[in-house]
């Protein structure tokens, strides 16, 4: 049985990673969002959730779940707390991804295995994947998207971006770079072309 190509989609905040993954999923790929997996741990009764409460305090518990806005307020702008939070969540995310890969290969029904990992290089996870796709967009365009989607502030955008390594460094390391400065239709077309190229390498 041939192994399924492992693809990571990464990029800076609001670059278009999720949209790219949606296109891949529409075309028959199995897709995992690392952020969604980490968010699933943010409940008090998981081992990760309890460690997050121990780290940040019981005030982050709201209606029997861990309030992501309260967590963000505490960790963005405090690098030590942010790194400690990542050390709690990321091992579980990687474990989930790798366990799912084994199951998806056995299912033999998907064209690619795609994982959206925003902090791929920052957590040293790139080597596990066969290909890395970097989604790139100008800072002002990304900021506009972020503000429109979240209703957040320029400061909250800047604080999130501060955790990411430089775009130039990631461009040098990625296998494929897809620019997303134009329309949604233009971007989706580029992702579809990328999918075809990846399928051609199998």
UniProtKB/Swiss-Prot annotation:
Belongs to the CoaE family. InterPro entries: Depp_CoAkinase (IPR001977), P-loop_NTPase (IPR027417). GO terms for molecular function: ATP binding; dephospho-CoA kinase activity. ATP binds at residues 14-19. This is Dephospho-CoA kinase. It comes from Chlamydia muridarum (strain MoPn / Nigg). The gene is coaE. GO terms for cellular component: cytoplasm. One of its GO terms (biological process) is coenzyme A biosynthetic process.
